[in-house]
């Protein structure tokens, strides 16, 4: 029922119906597209998964295996705070407290406070994120405070930038933020929707440079090379 933060968009309503009906709901978006369908309710059970995959591995037509899992399964602290535990630092498993403590101001919180201040002073300022609202400090309480001036498009960075471009055309001042690695997904929209059309928007890059995330899929070292050659785009890296 969630990916990172709460879900947004029309698809999730039908996915919920399928979960609640154990996959038997008459309204099934996958079958509507011509696929066969199998629902696995106990997706955290390895044996159940093996049984499901054994049933479909030799099938002669496309099938969607819809697997229901519990985020944080097996660790009560994570089960009770799913958004915060989507990603974490090394921690003490008994208490859930991080092994590294930090009590100063973070860039995330500083950025959120600045954007919130601008939003309160100007109702045309709109913050847009793609499923990672806390990358610029928009915790659940901040999201509620921002109201309609905060938009989470889900894991759809392409839509986030295209939406920002449309908002500009209608008099808004969009601020789009996501992690450095995720900007590669929306290169075309940045180039064609924003920059070719000279639509002014602010893009905030999180976890960039060698000081960002260091796993192979989330490296933040490519954004400047990728985007700085796009006409009408100015990349500022003050830190």
Regions found by a protein language model. Give the residues of each.
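A substrate-engagement module of RecA-like helicase motors
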Residues: 8-12, 16-24
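Mobile "lid/hinge" segments at catalytic clefts and subdomain interfaces of large enzymes
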Residues: 1-13, 29, 197, 231
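Thiamine diphosphate
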Residues: 21-25, 35-52, 58-239
